[in-house]
Amino acid sequence: MARLLLVDIGNSRIKWAIKDSLVFTAAAPRVHRGHQLSDLLDMDWGHIIAPDRIFISSVNIPALRSELDSWAALHWQLAPHYLVSSRRECGVVNAYDNAETLGSDRWAAMLAAFHQQQGAVCVIDCGTAITVDVISNEGRHLGGLILPGMIGMQSSLFQQTSLQPVAIKPVALTTLLGSNTHDCISLGIQHTLSALFVRLMMYLREELDTEPTCYLTGGDALAIQSLLPSATRYDPHLVLKGLALVASNA
């Protein structure tokens, strides 16, 4: 089997893994925002055995792709394959009017979750943005949601008001109301998300006539996991596993 380098480039972080035969080895993620990507690649990839193929899910930032393409060409004489969402793949049918406009990270995560579950799933990616995607038992993508992540919610509040920026940490949801500014902000964000997820699960039970299994991934997944009204499965490598699935069928 070919040695695959799988790469997930989000708005803030880069994650990667090597898949060789049946072995899947994921590296620790790195923050790329504010850094020279080529320097990070030197540190992480400069010492590894060259892959046979590179499969990438990436946000649409041309400068990042250009740096990555140049690095792969210089060091390995390889041209990466960038995942583009399609109408149908690996048993999942895309709900978007224009299939290619669905984020490739969302598509990869959906493919991996449905492949693992072989049934209805709700995929929640908790990164810079929070995305939600739902797939039926038959593999039909019902659509999704996009909203600001927890840090984005905090940042917009500080930018649009006279509140002084402070580091906001999650507060135990033992009460609805806070008694200081920090707790008021933290509880406001958490209860907003919690209410959304409760409403979402109620809707999906009616729409699907079953309760889908929720898969969580992304940097804030563990912080958000407790806000879900039903059992969840946390998988930090969901996008990378989706890329591996696509690569195995390429």
Predicted regions and their residues:
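Conserved phosphate-binding catalytic cores of ATP/NTP-utilizing and phosphoryl-transfer enzymes
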Residues: 1, 90-121, 242-250
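Glycine-rich phosphate-binding/hydrolytic loop that grips phosphoryl groups
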Residues: 162, 232-250
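Adenine-nucleotide phosphate-binding core of ATP-dependent small-molecule kinases
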Residues: 28, 173-213, 231
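N-terminal glycine/serine-rich phosphate-binding loop of ATP-dependent small-molecule kinases
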Residues: 1-89
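Gly/Thr-rich phosphate-binding beta-strand-loop-beta motif of the actin/hexokinase/Hsp70
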Residues: 1-24, 113, 117-141, 157, ...
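Glycine-rich phosphate-binding loops at beta-strand->alpha-helix junctions
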Residues: 13, 57-64, 211-227
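Glycine-rich phosphate-binding loop plus the immediately following alpha-helix
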Residues: 102, 111, 115-118, 142-186, ...
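Active-site regions of enzymes building and remodeling cell-envelope glycoconjugates
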Residues: 78, 97-99, 229-236
